[in-house]
Amino acid sequence: MKKIIPVLLLVVFAFYFQGCLTVETKEYTFKVKKDGSGEAVIKYINIMTDSKDSAGIPEKDYQDLINSYIKGDKLQEDYPHAKNMKKRLFEEDNQLCGEVKFDFDDITQFKFYKYKDKGPWCYYVTSSLGMFGGEQYFSSNGTYGGADMPVIFWDGKEKEFKFKTTVSQPAKNTMSLIDLWKSKGEK
C-alpha cells in the first residue's frame, strides 16, 4: 500500500500538469455533389493552450500542434475518409487559426444522414468531428433542433452545408498560441 500511494500521486501529478490544445470556435463547410462526393473546409478559430501558467506547457502544446496536426498525421487519423488533405495555420484578427481542406467520396462518412435518400439532410451535433473535442452548436445555414435534439436539418436541396460550433471560451488559464507561432515563423 505504501508503494501504491507515491505511484498514484505521480500519475495524478503528471495528468494535472499536462497541457491541452483547445480552440474557441470551429466553422465547417461541406459542398456536396449529386453523387454524395464533394469537398470540405474546417476552420479552427483562436487555437489556444489551456495551461497558460504551467512552465513549458504552452511551448509543448505548440510543438504538438505543429508536429502532430500540421506536419503529422493526426488530422488524417481523425478524418480517415478525407482525401487530398491540405492544412495550414494563419493569423486572423490577431488570433491563430487553422484550416483543413479535403475531398470526400461520400458525405455520409462525416456524420451526415439522409433518410432513404428522400428526406432532409441531417447532421447530429455531438462532441466532435475530430481535433479539439467538446463542441456545442452555435449557428448554421440549416435548422437546429435544439439542445434536446441536437440535430441540424437541411431541406434536402442544399449543396452546401455550413455550421459553426463553440469549443472553449478564452479564460484565465488559456493562452492564444499566436505569439508562439509568430516567434517560430512556421507558416
What are these regions (language model features)?
Residues 38, 48-50, 106-110:
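Residue-level signal for secondary-structure boundary sites
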Residues 1-4, 8-9:
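Positively charged n-region of N-terminal signal peptides that target proteins for export
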Residues 28-46:
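Post-signal peptide N-terminal segment of mature Sec-exported envelope proteins
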Residues 73-187:
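Mature, soluble, non-transmembrane domains
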Residues 23-27:
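Short, surface-exposed coil-to-beta transition loops
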Residues 14-17:
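Bacterial Sec-type N-terminal signal peptides, specifically the leucine/valine-rich hydrophobic h-region
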